[in-house]
Amino acid sequence: MDIKHNTPERDEFRATDGADVALWRWPQSKARPTLHWAHATGFHGRLYRPLLDELATDVNVLAWDMRGHGASAGAANVSTFRGWETYYRDMTALLDSQDEPVWLAGHSIGATTSIMAAARRPDKVLGLILAEPVIMDPVQGLKLGLAKLLRQSHRLSLAAGAARRRRVFDSHAAALDNYRGRGGFKTWPEAWLEAYVQHAFVPQEDQLQLACSPEWESTTFAHTEHNPWPGIRQLRCPVIALAAEHGSTFSPAAQKRLQTLLPSADVRVVAGTTHFLPMEQNDTVRDAIQQLALSGCREN
């Protein structure tokens, strides 16, 4: 299949609270395995088109816009938000909407959400490919859990920084110029930056406004999962976990503990990468997904 023709179409599924969550579908074929990709906080599914368009030649690709993000911005509701548990429930509802088991892959919160959904619906998940999952070791988790208990987690750097994020631009070109070479975007190839900007905004009169509001992004960071281990212990499917060499959200101590709990898991540190591993090492993520999703294997 020609990569140029791998254009996703919008679909949606109904979350348990009645909200509609956008789901992007690349061209599908019954003969191929299905893979769902879950994006990182503040982003959207079509950001990952440089990766997903390639994968769509071999697998049926799905990618949601997480609640409050991208085309699902309208599903944001702070009054009913229950931290990352809300996203876990949404992903579980997505799995329930599928006729057949699927492979789950994701980046950052998307990877962690995939873990929790797989733990809750083991019959619906064939395996996990995790790129920079947010998996804290017990010491990190204790500190964050205490900050959340004391209602101070909104002061943490990621949450505070997101709350200050610029939300309005005059044009897509102005947004590109603002992001290029700055902050977390420093290591992004141009194609990735363009894919992000293309679908990150909604019209606001004669300007553009971030679809994922700074308040929603900040709230999501403030509720970062501090104890994913009960879910990890329940996993029974194949797992590949890719960790960054620098500034990883999947610390060496957490890697060691996961490997102890899941001896068959394939844990790899990708040299030279940061938390934005999928953008920096697109081929590495693609190869890991193909290794599992095209293998036809499944642990029982």
Language-model region placement:
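Conserved serine/cysteine hydrolase catalytic core
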Residues: H199-T260
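Conserved hydrolase catalytic core segment
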Residues: E100-L144
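Conserved HGGG/HGGXW glycine-rich cap/lid loop of the alpha/beta-hydrolase fold
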Residues: A22-A76
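Active-site loop/oxyanion-hole signature of alpha/beta-hydrolase fold enzymes
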Residues: M66-A105, L146, D287
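Flexible "cap/lid" loop of the alpha/beta hydrolase fold
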Residues: L126-V168
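Catalytic histidine-centered segment of alpha/beta-hydrolase-like enzymes
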Residues: V270-N282
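Conserved alpha/beta-hydrolase catalytic His-Asp/Glu region
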Residues: A163-A222
